Swiss-Prot record:
Superkingdom per UniProt: Bacteria
Family: Belongs to the UPF0102 family.
CDD domains the record matches: PoNe_Nuclease
UniProt feature coiled coil, ranges: none
Record's protein name: UPF0102 protein RoseRS_1723
Gene Ontology molecular functions: nucleic acid binding
Amino acid sequence: MAERRRRLGDWGEAVAVAYLAQHGYQVVAQKWRCAAGEIDIVAQRDGVLAFVEVRTRRGVDPGMAAGSITGAKRARLMMLACLFLAAHDLPADTPWRIDVVAIAVASQGRVAIDHILAAVEET
């Protein structure tokens, strides 16, 4: 079961990369890792870095995938974004946000994608 879930997640990330590229984003990094965790995708468009969390679920509603991000996950994503900026010596005033690309795969194979800009904000 874990292998099937990992394959679905990897597939979802590939779909998200293609989607972002089609919408004018340049992918800067994929699966960026540090001791604190992983950022699925880092992309840039119009001078703004987007740290993208990809959520892929079976079902018909991409909102279900987006809604699966807990408060702890939101806090971790904020921390990881700051660590990425520091690791790449980017200026403190670099514009950035955390997006979610939610992907729902219906049983008939139809795919629904919802790109939520600035889905995670500081609280």
